[in-house]
Swiss-Prot record:
InterPro entries in alphabetical order: ZapC (IPR009809), ZapC_C (IPR048372), ZapC_N (IPR048373)
Tree of life domain: Bacteria
Function text: Contributes to the efficiency of the cell division process by stabilizing the polymeric form of the cell division protein FtsZ. Acts by promoting interactions between FtsZ protofilaments and suppressing the GTPase activity of FtsZ.
Transmembrane segments: none
Keyword terms: Cell cycle, Cell division, Cytoplasm, Septation
GO annotation, cellular component aspect: cytoplasm
Keyword Cell division in record: yes
Subunit organization: Interacts directly with FtsZ.
Name the record gives this protein: Cell division protein ZapC
Length: 184
């Protein structure tokens, strides 16, 4: 992914596309519809320091995992996460799509989770949490929520904390680390 020193947010009112201009030749389109976004009344806007910080944190978080364990490129996920954090419309929780977990408290340092709809299970990046809710971005290629509803990759959903499941990739890496320590 090529980049210049200043990335720009682009919003095309005709196509309804929010994009990031990374260089003169490289533009990254986000999957979000105008109805999912707020504060998009511009054609071109520079990314600010908060955007850069969000991008950096998400990139570093996802790059810490083996590439073969991640269903998407860390930079693509980071760009979409940054776009959502900046322009995403606040959501009402949609916890009813997902099965409850047995976890009473979610560790703040845990940034990946899984959600299970009973139809499908997906890997998510936790964008933010409060005492009750988590806003999660789907990293998996897609996820079936019900017989008639699905989520596409990089779409965001808000759920209660009691729906979050530990990410299988975290459990596998933890087990691998424990085995390595026992063998040493």
């Amino acid at each position: 992914m090529e980049s210049e020193s200043h990335w720009l947010w682009l919003f095309n009112t005709e196509s309804g596309k929010l994009s990031v201009k990374l260089s003169d030749t490289d533009v990254f389109d986000t999957p979000y519809k105008p109805s999912q976004l707020v504060n998009i009344h511009f054609n071109e806007q520079m990314m600010d320091i908060e955007d850069a910080t969000t991008f950096q944190i998400v990139s570093e978080t996802l790059e810490a995992y083996p590439a073969d364990k991640m269903p998407c490129a860390p930079q693509n996920a980071a760009l979409n996460a940054t776009a959502w954090c900046r322009f995403g419309r606040p959501q009402m929780p949609q916890s009813w799509h997902f099965q409850k977990s047995d976890i009473s408290e979610w560790p703040l340092e845990r940034r990946l989770c899984e959600l299970n709809s009973g139809f499908d299970q997906g890997l998510f990046l936790i964008l933010d949490t409060d005492d009750e809710f988590a806003t999660c971005l789907l990293l998996s290629e897609g996820m079936q929520l019900s017989a008639i509803k699905s989520l596409r990759q990089y779409h965001v959903i808000k759920v209660t904390l009691n729906r979050l499941l530990p990410a299988t990739v975290d459990l596998a890496l933890s087990a691998q680390s424990n085995w390595g320590q026992q063998l040493a």
